[in-house]
Curated annotation (Swiss-Prot):
This is Lysine-specific demethylase 3A-A. It catalyses: N(6),N(6)-dimethyl-L-lysyl(9)-[histone H3] + 2 2-oxoglutarate + 2 O2 = L-lysyl(9)-[histone H3] + 2 formaldehyde + 2 succinate + 2 CO2. One of its GO terms (molecular function) is histone H3K9 demethylase activity. InterPro entries: DUF7030, JHDM2-like, JmjC_dom, KDM3AB_Tudor, PWWP_KDM3B. It holds the Pfam family DUF7030. GO terms for biological process: regulation of transcription by RNA polymerase II. Its cofactor is Fe(2+).
Amino acid sequence: MVLTQQENLSVLVGQRFTCLLGTDLQLDPDGVSKWPWKSGIVRAASHKDLHCPEIKIFVEFDDEAWEKRTWIELYGATVKMFLVEHNLVLADRVSPSNSVPVQCPAMVYKVLVGKFSLGTATCLQFLGDKDKLFLSKELVKPVRDRETLKQFMQENKTFNKAFQELIRKSVDESRLQQATRNIIGMPINVYSMDPSMQWFSATISNVRTASRALEIKCEQLPSLKIIDPALLHVVLVHNYGDLNDKSRKPRAPKRKSQDTESEDQTELKQTRNEEVPSKDVTQKTSFLTYRRDDGKTLVVVDNPKATNNLFNYINTTTEDQQKVQQQSLSSKQSVPVGFGEALLGCAATTPGILNAATPPQANSPPSFGAATPQGKGTQNLPGDTTLLNGEAKREETNLFLSAAASQGNKRSLGFGMMESPSTFSSLSSMPSWSGQPKSENGPKSENLFAAFTNSSTVFPKGFEFSVKSFPEQKMLSVTDSPKTAPPMTCVQQQEQKVVKKPENNHTSVRAIKPQEPPYPKSPNKNDGVTYPRSILLDPQKLKRLQQSGDCFVQDGSCNDIAPHLHKCRECRLDRFGRSREQRDSAVFCRFFHFRRLHFNKHGMLKEGGFLTPNKYDAEAINLWLPLASNVVDLDLDTAKYILANIGDHFCKLVMSEKEVMSATDPSKQVAWKRAVRGVREMCDACDTTIFNLHWVCPKCGFGVCVDCYRMKKKSLSSGEDGNETFSWLKCVKGQLHEPENLMPTQIVPGKALYDVGDIVHSVRGRWGIKSNCLCSNKHVRPVVKPVVKEEVKPSTPEPEPTKAPLAQPNVCTAPDPIAIPSTPPTPACSSPLSWLTNLSQTTVNKENKDNLFASNLEHKPLPSFASFGKPVSALQTFGSSILTPTTSNNSGFLRNLLNSSTLKQETNEKSTPKILDDIFASLVQSRPLSDFARKPQGLPIQPSLMGFNTPHYWLCDNRLLCLQDPNNKSNWNVFRECWKQGQPVIVSGIHNNLNSELWRPESFRREFGDQEADLVNCRTNDIITGATVGDFWEGFEDISARLKNDKGEAMVLKLKDWPPGEDFRDTMLSRFEDLMNNIPLPEYTRREGKLNLAARLPAYFVRPDLGPKMYNAYGLITPEDRKYGTTNLHLDVSDATNVMVYVGIPKGEHDQEQEVIRTIQDGDADELTIKRYIEFKEKPGALWHIFAAKDTEKIRQFLKKVAEEQGHENPPDHDPIHDQSWYLDNTLRKRLLQEHGVQGWAIVQFLGDAVFIPAGAPHQVHNLYSCIKVAEDFVSPEHVKHCFWLTQEFRYLSHTHTNHEDKLQVKNVIYHAVKDSIAILKANEASLGKL
């Protein structure tokens, strides 16, 4: 059996240790046991990183009173040796009853700091003893043979009790360190740093899963709100008093657990009236399983039988569970000062969980619910950051040649136990260690080991037990699809099973959304990802595979499954301790659920190739199919709008994939890399997210995208291999990766991508959605979908698959495959969406990328307004809706258009709103170019004429829409007509709805003032380290309190990357809710907004982090500061809205108002903007300059020219815009307008204004006063094109650039947005006849 802890629990707090302290120690090398060892327990730590050279630990020694506790520097000069408890082993010990040496369980200690050599000796402590011994490593053996060990524990109560204490301690520590939701409401004891007390009591009010901190309520220390179990010792407290009532009916068990401490610690706690219930080891303990609160794994607990059982749990009714779920938890957060060094390095940066859910009982594990794939535990080398290991000794042999294999993990705490011929054979007849006669209840009292023989038992998250029988589980099928399958596409096959016709044809089919927190949390990497146990851990299936030699899919890491075979890159790095910290090494294995294995005739595990595209199962294919049952928060109208805007983009994506597939060598078998939950496939060369087709090395799993593969082949053919833009990593033993040795691999199973492409065309035709894609042009030679290459030799069916694979879909509705050219024919007329086609057939490199970007971002004209007379079902696409300004006089245009007879004849009640939208959109851009030079007069447009009751006005020479009511339900209709033109938009008045107390500087200073933070000097861009958040907030509105430079001048600072962490919601829950409840245009801006395409990405994938993010900075007021920017010119890959939540006017500076007015005027703001400041007394916060995305290349060339004039270099892997190294002052903006004709929008953002910035639009910010801004990113259907282009641009940035890595996954977003849209449209096809 194997008990391992999968988390990288490199945590010292709560662990027992033994050490040598002193400076001048005279030690006898042969008398290790006589050295002055001191043992104790670690109570607190200053840092989480054990390798930090400055880490200090707060310890209590066993032979001293707790009042003498002290801090010691772990790597200081006085610490000569430091050993911590490591894992469970067996060692010889003489039985007191008959003086016969027997092997007994013991805890071995691992050397963490070793300045002296122990030689061949190792430190261990027998379970139940306090003394530590030093024995030869040869006498220590790993634990084997579960059954005999179980019997040994039953007959020896001392070991039984100690082992249960050890297990319970590990369970409690795991729950606390993982911050599981089902500990909310539980009482705890927290170690006190106050000299007057050792412990104090508290209650867990909330958990923060990201930083794994606990929010607590404490009567003794009311100011203490947040603690981190990794830095301060925390133990769970359990109450078993209610179990005395034997008349209570059996109820579903509620998981509880209790911390274990040594007996002397318990006594100390009892002296402070903190008594712990007594424990009777003779009491029978039975085990049940239930699903964790997050539903991710199963947990072993005890079924309550009596009051004195160690693992009894309080029974709760359903009503009790509902009450727990409905508790309202406080979101206030603060870091206490009283903890001193104990909390050094601890930042409260995680979210609170609103609801505490009680886990339901489960009698068997889920089919996909094991915590990690099983395999062999690897021993950590010195380079690894892991403190605790789960295996006593690493063996470089095939782990699964025996019927019962072991499991482990490189990050295991561990109790590594492996099955083999019995090591406990002599224990069955051995007398009881305690010398007592066998109790009558002895044989029945299986205690902890009852779980080992239960096939449905799995230990808490982080623990696994390898047993002789396992439940049935899902396996990847590798059998060939039947050749006689009916001619149906994979989409049609699933539709017959899932999609049903709506009962009401007039109502769109909408899937019921599961109950979730009101604001979905941005998922962390591999958060809660679980997979079934390895097939090799089932003895029966293992034996069958060995006998038959059938192929099966690798379902664990290379190190665990087959250490003697080729290891992938991740597993090789993982083996040598150089891999990044990750929760589950198997999930990140390149060959996980990808490579096939089989046993040869000698029983050795061998490679059997890789999965092919036709080897999918229902779960794999459903992720990629348009199934209405999987779609939430999407209505019929929104689906049509999304498809009208991004349908052509999707078609070009499919065309590009077809062309690449058709250009591959027909002799090469295409592999299928199954999408792995919680893992983002990325190119190893350019860090771009891989959508589908890519090339993989079969030896190490190295993978490159289509573009990098094409560039490499071109550089090799031209003899310029040393000059390629992206270097390739080397393979095993340092060999170079040659393109011809890589295998083509796809991620989308089967022909699902091409099937969805066919459905897009048919659905758009049925619903009258206009399309401009190449594949809809009759003059273009049709490009049929490529046939997925079958294996040369069919594979042997997999033994006993739990879910039969779907029949190989026959989706060829077109003629037989024909030869497809490597580049598509040029259409008769250029399409506005030719950008993606050009991209797919053009090799982008350093020399031609600038010209490529410029040539494909040209402004395309539109048909005349006569097209508005067409049926409204022919929806406008993004490309076809871009309108160019006309030179005709627009006087009376709106009235004439409304009174036209054609419009009256063809307009009905349904189509009027859409027609008015188009009229409004055309009106925005239908002005003479000469009007740009006029001073702003405002455009008095009556809302009634627009068809919407939407208060608004115009700024920036009538080029900038400003919506005045953030709560107006019609805002998004008006907004999108300007938004689709690529124009920024302002929404004002948001501050009136916000809770102003939450956004004041005082509240931030009070809650987070002690946190360390990096500050940036806005004048010099220098980073100031060692400061605190409080230092920044103290000078926010007081110039005299600001930090000074070397000359004694107050610096203009901004907080860099604060608050830290991936999710704003984790750190500031109450502010997050306040913002999300009041953010304008929630259809676009909320995480689940129906027009936010990022919401369409399934939770199966790693969703992009789109904010919110805070931007806090002082104002630049002086005339000299006008050449500096708070945020220099840059652009973002996604759309964004930036809300001004607070404006602070600092005291201590004269003539601020006059300087602000001059700065606004110097920034080219219009008269209406100045009027808002002077007459309406609004608070101006920041001056923005935003430029159109189509002008990006002109600005780039202009800045390069200016850089050359100033003698600066322009490295090829850097970009003047992406580097954020320029601020365009008045002089540069005038040159840009005169030399390139580029004019942007000068916007002054007042308090409560939300500025919407389109994706790809260059912009810069200059704070006028001290500002607190919060930005939220989103992906709108109108700007997907720019998102994609920016992703391509970012590929060429240096690897140190913050924007280099592709986190948005535009192709995945496009695919799943289209997939969901057509699912809704197909489900509503029955309603077409009713329209």
